[in-house]
Amino acid sequence: MKLIVGLGNPGREYELTRHNIGFMAIDELAKRWNISLNEQKFKGVFGAGFVNGEKVILLKPLTYMNLSGESIRPLMDYYKIDVEDFVVMYDDLDIPVGKLRLRMKGSAGGHNGVKSTISHLGTQEFQRIRMGIDRPKNGMKVVDYVLGRFTSEEIPDVNHSIEKAADACEEWLNKPFLQIMNTFNS
């Protein structure tokens, strides 16, 4: 069984914001795999299905970004999901819009959703798909930037990165994460 989590904030006001690109990637996977995200439990919304013979759970924590681990850990415990069968997708300021970086482990890099996940799992050793949102320009505050929407010029690149993140997840069902890293980080 595999768990794929997208980080974001709940509520209409946060839909389609930079900070919610992880939610957008989960929505893409749910659409591709015909998985309904209609279960509400573990402080999140999730759905499960079978993809190429593998049971997959898709989760969007509804705790707000900074408390994401409060949703992820209980679900992993309940379904007895090992950390190597878990991947998290989230926004990253240090990567250009439209680009991805896959990592096997590492620090939170200043991302509070990842920090919460590390804290609740008790380890940094989990797989991540970091989705580029770039840094704010013209002295804009980071919080205003990440909670802002993508520009119309950015949308094609954003859609491309969502598709690539979904492609990476799809490949991960059948291949080691390290192998997919080599493909998607090049």
Swiss-Prot record:
Role according to the record: Hydrolyzes ribosome-free peptidyl-tRNAs (with 1 or more amino acids incorporated), which drop off the ribosome during protein synthesis, or as a result of ribosome stalling. Catalyzes the release of premature peptidyl moieties from peptidyl-tRNA molecules trapped in stalled 50S ribosomal subunits, and thus maintains levels of free tRNAs and 50S ribosomes.
Residues where tRNA binds: Y14, Y64, N66, N112
Protein name (Swiss-Prot/TrEMBL): Peptidyl-tRNA hydrolase
Active site: H19
InterPro entries, A to Z: Pept_tRNA_hydro, Pept_tRNA_hydro_CS, Pept_tRNA_hydro_sf
PANTHER family noted in UniProt: PEPTIDYL-TRNA HYDROLASE
GO biological process, one term: rescue of stalled ribosome
Enzyme Commission code(s) on record: 3.1.1.29
Name of one Pfam family that matches: Pept_tRNA_hydro
Family membership: Belongs to the PTH family.
Complex and partners: Monomer.
Site (Stabilizes the basic form of H active site to accept a proton): D91
Marked site: Discriminates between blocked and unblocked aminoacyl-tRNA: N9
Biological source species: Bacillus cereus (strain ATCC 14579 / DSM 31 / CCUG 7414 / JCM 2152 / NBRC 15305 / NCIMB 9373 / NCTC 2599 / NRRL B-3711)
Main subcellular location: cytoplasm
Top-tier EC class: hydrolase
GO molecular function, one term: tRNA binding
Gene name for this UniProt entry: pth
Compartmental location: Cytoplasm
Key words of the record: Cytoplasm, Hydrolase, RNA-binding, tRNA-binding
GO cellular component, one term: cytoplasm
Catalysed conversion reaction: an N-acyl-L-alpha-aminoacyl-tRNA + H2O = an N-acyl-L-amino acid + a tRNA + H(+)
